[in-house]
Amino acid sequence: MRPLKLTMSAFGPYAGRMELDFETLGSSGLYLITGDTGAGKTTIFDAISFALFGEASGGNREPGMLRSKYADPTTPTEVTLTFRYAGKEYTITRNPEYQRPKGRGAGMTRQAANATLLLPEGDPVTKPKEVNMAIRELLGIDREQFAQVAMIAQGDFLSCCWRTPRTGRRFSGICSTPTSMWSFRTGSADRPTR
């Protein structure tokens, strides 16, 4: 699975709309996301994981915590991820449950959690549970497995490099090819760098 584009709206520390185009990073398939503490690195992982599985990348963040506390109340909270898998392109859009202003009158109302998966062929999958099942069937893994094989969390890079065959060395080529790595630097610039 290769991420192509990630769009976040009122998600985590991002009050507005933030778009990351992974295609600008090349086709090596290994991306390094760097930035200062609090710049939003983990939020990128959370957004990808939430789009795919309806859960943040870390077990301590509930979907209700994903709405930006800095967002305007009228800005919708959602994540859209376009990715390529087995040569086909998929787009998934998902929003957590959150409070938003009522359409009529004063006060707030609950925005229900929603998910839509656009398939390369055929009708879209439109209910969160059905999208979850479709993603699991497509990728063959759940969120926990995805977090272990597709994303190396902050602080876990060295432990992945030092794994032995006995402990399950899954990332054997990562430490040996640093020149093939591209990165997103999070923060004020938010531009891809090589």
Please tell me what each predicted stretch does.
Residues 1-133, 137-139, 143-145:
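Extreme N-terminal "head/tail" segments of very large remodeling/mechanoenzyme assemblies
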Residues 32-36, 50, 116, 126, ...:
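Extended, Lys/Glu-rich alpha-helical coiled-coil stalks
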